[in-house]
Amino acid sequence: SNTGPFGDAFAPPYDDPYVVTSGSTTGSSESLADVQPPNDQAAEKAVLGAMLLSKDLPPLMHQIVRAEDFYTPAHGRIYDAIIKLSSNEEPADAVTVADQLEKDGELERIGGRPYLHTLIESVPSPASGPYYAQIVAEKALLRRLIDAGMRITSYGYAATEGMEVEEMVNRCLLYTSDAADEG
């Protein structure tokens, strides 16, 4: 049963499978500090690889996923370079993206030219790129919700006598609304 951080007095009246307390939702003994935020590295690599293989995909992917949706910062940088080239109607393949990243001073930070070829090799099918992009976007939304939850929790703990509870509630609602709207 879920007793919550303050014992049984504040526990929900039911077991919520989505509440993570001392472990993960799978019942392992990991603490929340040990749990990696939601992400899917295979999907991130497949999105980028698909974009490198198909000149038609970058505009479509840009409607589904943004650079900040990638958990791995290097993947966001690569995505930005692909979108930059594509929006200028230039080819966005491993060679041109590497050149763009080099101009931007980012090539070594993303793992160099060989990493771009690794991305291409990781794509099961470029046609599935939009599906992988949706996975990346959903994982990013989950991370934003976690961030909103952490902010809400900190408001609850930081409440002072002078702070209006209604104002705190409105801020908390704004955080969750913003997290959902960005998704």
What would you call each of these model-derived segments?
Residues 149-160:
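Secondary-structure edge/capping motif, primarily at the C-terminal ends of alpha-helices
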Residues 175-180:
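Conserved small/polar residues in nucleotide/adenosyl-binding loops
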Residues 20-21, 168-170:
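N-terminal non-cleavable signal-anchor helices
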Residues 1-141:
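Noncatalytic partner-interaction/assembly domains of nucleic-acid and motor enzyme complexes
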Residues 149, 169-174:
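Short amphipathic alpha-helical coiled-coil/interface segments
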Residues 183:
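Extended, polar beta-sheet/loop recognition surfaces of beta-rich domains
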